[in-house]
Amino acid sequence: MRVRKRKGAEEHLANHPQYVILEPEAAKGKWHQIFGNDNPIHIEVGSGKGAFITGMAQQNPDINYIGIDIQLSVLSYALDKVLASGVENVKLLRVDGSALTNYFEDGEVDMMYLNFSDPWPKSRHEKRRLTYKTFLDTYKQILPKNGEIHLKTDNRGFFEYSLTSFSQYGMILNKVWLDLHASDYEGNVMTEYERKFSEKGQAIYRVEAQFKD
Protein backbone atom coordinates (compact mmCIF):
# COMPACT_ATOMS: atom_id res chain seq x y z
CA MET A 1 0.00 0.00 0.00
CA ARG A 2 1.53 3.27 -1.15
CA VAL A 3 0.43 6.45 0.59
CA ARG A 4 1.61 10.03 0.60
CA LYS A 5 4.35 10.89 3.03
CA ARG A 6 2.74 11.87 6.31
CA LYS A 7 4.18 14.85 8.12
CA GLY A 8 5.26 13.98 11.64
CA ALA A 9 4.93 10.22 11.10
CA GLU A 10 8.33 9.38 12.54
CA GLU A 11 7.74 11.47 15.66
CA HIS A 12 4.27 9.97 16.05
CA LEU A 13 5.72 6.45 16.10
CA ALA A 14 8.55 7.42 18.43
CA ASN A 15 6.08 8.88 20.94
CA HIS A 16 4.35 5.52 21.45
CA PRO A 17 7.02 2.97 22.41
CA GLN A 18 4.38 0.90 24.21
CA TYR A 19 3.10 -0.06 20.75
CA VAL A 20 5.96 0.65 18.35
CA ILE A 21 9.14 -1.39 18.72
CA LEU A 22 11.89 1.14 18.11
CA GLU A 23 14.82 -1.30 18.42
CA PRO A 24 13.54 -4.41 16.63
CA GLU A 25 16.81 -6.37 16.70
CA ALA A 26 16.79 -6.19 20.50
CA ALA A 27 13.34 -7.79 20.57
CA LYS A 28 14.53 -11.06 19.05
CA GLY A 29 13.79 -13.92 21.43
CA LYS A 30 12.04 -11.58 23.86
CA TRP A 31 8.60 -11.15 22.36
CA HIS A 32 6.71 -12.87 25.17
CA GLN A 33 8.57 -10.68 27.62
CA ILE A 34 7.64 -7.58 25.61
CA PHE A 35 3.97 -8.53 25.61
CA GLY A 36 4.13 -9.55 29.25
CA ASN A 37 2.49 -12.93 28.71
CA ASP A 38 2.95 -16.33 27.04
CA ASN A 39 0.07 -16.01 24.59
CA PRO A 40 0.55 -17.10 20.97
CA ILE A 41 2.21 -14.61 18.65
CA HIS A 42 0.72 -13.91 15.21
CA ILE A 43 2.36 -11.57 12.70
CA GLU A 44 1.05 -9.80 9.62
CA VAL A 45 3.69 -8.97 7.01
CA GLY A 46 2.58 -5.90 5.10
CA SER A 47 0.05 -4.69 7.65
CA GLY A 48 -0.90 -1.51 5.79
CA LYS A 49 -3.04 0.95 7.74
CA GLY A 50 -3.82 -1.59 10.42
CA ALA A 51 -7.49 -2.51 9.92
CA PHE A 52 -6.79 -6.25 9.90
CA ILE A 53 -4.30 -6.42 12.75
CA THR A 54 -6.46 -4.19 14.96
CA GLY A 55 -9.63 -6.09 14.16
CA MET A 56 -7.97 -9.43 14.87
CA ALA A 57 -6.63 -8.12 18.17
CA GLN A 58 -10.12 -7.03 19.18
CA GLN A 59 -11.59 -10.42 18.27
CA ASN A 60 -8.83 -12.40 19.97
CA PRO A 61 -7.55 -10.71 23.15
CA ASP A 62 -5.64 -13.87 24.13
CA ILE A 63 -3.41 -13.68 21.05
CA ASN A 64 -0.51 -11.26 20.61
CA TYR A 65 -0.33 -9.54 17.22
CA ILE A 66 2.58 -7.86 15.48
CA GLY A 67 1.95 -5.67 12.44
CA ILE A 68 4.95 -5.34 10.14
CA ASP A 69 5.35 -2.73 7.43
CA ILE A 70 8.41 -1.00 6.01
CA GLN A 71 6.61 2.26 5.13
CA LEU A 72 6.80 4.93 7.79
CA SER A 73 3.60 6.80 6.93
CA VAL A 74 1.55 3.63 6.57
CA LEU A 75 2.67 2.37 9.96
CA SER A 76 1.77 5.69 11.54
CA TYR A 77 -1.81 5.28 10.30
CA ALA A 78 -1.85 1.77 11.72
CA LEU A 79 -0.81 3.25 15.05
CA ASP A 80 -3.81 5.60 14.88
CA LYS A 81 -6.12 2.59 14.60
CA VAL A 82 -4.42 0.78 17.46
CA LEU A 83 -4.69 3.84 19.70
CA ALA A 84 -8.34 4.43 18.80
CA SER A 85 -9.26 0.79 19.44
CA GLY A 86 -7.67 0.63 22.86
CA VAL A 87 -6.26 -2.86 22.27
CA GLU A 88 -3.20 -3.80 24.27
CA ASN A 89 -2.21 -6.98 22.41
CA VAL A 90 -0.65 -5.31 19.35
CA LYS A 91 2.87 -4.20 18.56
CA LEU A 92 4.06 -2.50 15.38
CA LEU A 93 7.35 -3.09 13.66
CA ARG A 94 8.90 -1.05 10.87
CA VAL A 95 11.15 -3.59 9.15
CA ASP A 96 11.53 -5.38 5.83
CA GLY A 97 9.66 -8.66 5.56
CA SER A 98 12.66 -10.33 3.93
CA ALA A 99 14.75 -10.06 7.11
CA LEU A 100 12.41 -11.54 9.70
CA THR A 101 15.09 -13.83 11.14
CA ASN A 102 16.81 -10.68 12.41
CA TYR A 103 13.84 -9.99 14.68
CA PHE A 104 12.44 -13.41 15.60
CA GLU A 105 14.05 -16.55 16.97
CA ASP A 106 13.39 -19.94 15.40
CA GLY A 107 9.82 -20.95 16.16
CA GLU A 108 9.02 -17.73 18.01
CA VAL A 109 6.04 -16.89 15.79
CA ASP A 110 2.94 -19.10 15.97
CA MET A 111 1.07 -17.90 12.87
CA MET A 112 1.55 -15.45 10.04
CA TYR A 113 -0.69 -13.56 7.64
CA LEU A 114 -0.01 -12.23 4.16
CA ASN A 115 -2.81 -9.91 3.09
CA PHE A 116 -2.99 -8.28 -0.32
CA SER A 117 0.75 -8.41 -0.86
CA ASP A 118 2.23 -6.68 -3.90
CA PRO A 119 1.82 -9.28 -6.68
CA TRP A 120 4.91 -8.15 -8.60
CA PRO A 121 3.38 -9.45 -11.86
CA LYS A 122 6.47 -9.15 -14.06
CA SER A 123 8.55 -12.32 -14.30
CA ARG A 124 11.78 -10.47 -13.61
CA HIS A 125 10.38 -9.47 -10.21
CA GLU A 126 9.41 -13.00 -9.13
CA LYS A 127 11.97 -13.05 -6.32
CA ARG A 128 10.24 -10.05 -4.72
CA ARG A 129 6.94 -11.88 -4.28
CA LEU A 130 6.33 -12.68 -0.62
CA THR A 131 5.51 -16.29 -1.48
CA TYR A 132 8.73 -16.91 -3.40
CA LYS A 133 10.76 -19.83 -2.05
CA THR A 134 13.41 -17.73 -0.31
CA PHE A 135 10.68 -15.97 1.68
CA LEU A 136 9.19 -19.36 2.54
CA ASP A 137 12.59 -20.42 3.88
CA THR A 138 12.46 -17.46 6.26
CA TYR A 139 8.87 -18.06 7.32
CA LYS A 140 9.54 -21.73 8.02
CA GLN A 141 12.42 -20.78 10.27
CA ILE A 142 10.49 -18.41 12.53
CA LEU A 143 7.32 -20.52 12.64
CA PRO A 144 6.94 -23.72 14.69
CA LYS A 145 6.80 -27.17 13.13
CA ASN A 146 3.62 -27.42 11.08
CA GLY A 147 3.28 -23.63 11.24
CA GLU A 148 0.69 -21.95 9.05
CA ILE A 149 0.48 -19.03 6.64
CA HIS A 150 -2.93 -17.52 5.93
CA LEU A 151 -3.01 -15.51 2.71
CA LYS A 152 -5.65 -13.26 1.14
CA THR A 153 -5.49 -11.44 -2.17
CA ASP A 154 -7.67 -10.04 -4.93
CA ASN A 155 -5.09 -10.94 -7.59
CA ARG A 156 -5.87 -14.28 -9.26
CA GLY A 157 -2.43 -14.55 -10.86
CA PHE A 158 -0.62 -14.00 -7.57
CA PHE A 159 -2.97 -16.42 -5.83
CA GLU A 160 -2.32 -19.19 -8.35
CA TYR A 161 1.41 -18.49 -8.17
CA SER A 162 1.30 -18.72 -4.37
CA LEU A 163 -0.62 -22.01 -4.41
CA THR A 164 1.99 -23.45 -6.75
CA SER A 165 4.86 -22.06 -4.69
CA PHE A 166 3.43 -23.49 -1.46
CA SER A 167 2.84 -26.88 -3.08
CA GLN A 168 6.29 -27.06 -4.66
CA TYR A 169 7.79 -26.22 -1.28
CA GLY A 170 6.01 -29.26 0.15
CA MET A 171 3.40 -27.34 2.11
CA ILE A 172 -0.13 -28.60 2.70
CA LEU A 173 -3.00 -26.50 1.36
CA ASN A 174 -5.50 -27.07 4.15
CA LYS A 175 -8.26 -24.80 2.88
CA VAL A 176 -8.70 -22.77 -0.30
CA TRP A 177 -11.36 -20.15 -1.07
CA LEU A 178 -11.90 -18.82 -4.58
CA ASP A 179 -14.57 -16.35 -3.47
CA LEU A 180 -14.20 -15.76 0.25
CA HIS A 181 -17.10 -13.37 0.69
CA ALA A 182 -19.51 -15.74 -1.04
CA SER A 183 -18.50 -18.59 1.27
CA ASP A 184 -19.68 -19.55 4.75
CA TYR A 185 -16.33 -18.58 6.30
CA GLU A 186 -16.92 -16.87 9.63
CA GLY A 187 -14.80 -14.40 11.54
CA ASN A 188 -13.23 -12.69 8.53
CA VAL A 189 -11.59 -9.36 9.33
CA MET A 190 -11.23 -7.18 6.27
CA THR A 191 -8.22 -5.10 5.33
CA GLU A 192 -8.56 -1.65 3.77
CA TYR A 193 -7.87 -3.11 0.32
CA GLU A 194 -10.30 -5.97 0.87
CA ARG A 195 -13.16 -3.64 1.71
CA LYS A 196 -12.41 -1.51 -1.34
CA PHE A 197 -12.29 -4.46 -3.72
CA SER A 198 -15.27 -6.29 -2.26
CA GLU A 199 -17.44 -3.18 -2.65
CA LYS A 200 -16.67 -3.40 -6.37
CA GLY A 201 -17.82 -7.02 -6.44
CA GLN A 202 -14.33 -8.41 -6.88
CA ALA A 203 -13.63 -11.96 -5.69
CA ILE A 204 -11.28 -12.35 -2.73
CA TYR A 205 -9.04 -15.42 -2.67
CA ARG A 206 -7.82 -17.05 0.53
CA VAL A 207 -5.65 -20.02 1.46
CA GLU A 208 -4.47 -21.62 4.68
CA ALA A 209 -1.13 -23.29 3.96
CA GLN A 210 0.85 -25.39 6.42
CA PHE A 211 4.51 -26.36 6.55
CA LYS A 212 5.43 -29.99 6.99
CA ASP A 213 8.08 -31.15 9.49
From Swiss-Prot:
GO terms for cellular component: tRNA methyltransferase complex. Pfam families: Methyltransf_4 (PF02390). It comes from Streptococcus thermophilus (strain ATCC BAA-250 / LMG 18311). It catalyses: guanosine(46) in tRNA + S-adenosyl-L-methionine = N(7)-methylguanosine(46) in tRNA + S-adenosyl-L-homocysteine. S-adenosyl-L-methionine binds at residues 44, 69, 96, 118. Keywords: Methyltransferase, S-adenosyl-L-methionine, Transferase, tRNA processing. Pathway: tRNA modification; N(7)-methylguanine-tRNA biosynthesis. This is tRNA (guanine-N(7)-)-methyltransferase. HAMAP family: tRNA_methyltr_TrmB. Gene3D superfamilies: Vaccinia Virus protein VP39. GO terms for molecular function: tRNA (guanine(46)-N7)-methyltransferase activity. Its EC number is 2.1.1.33.
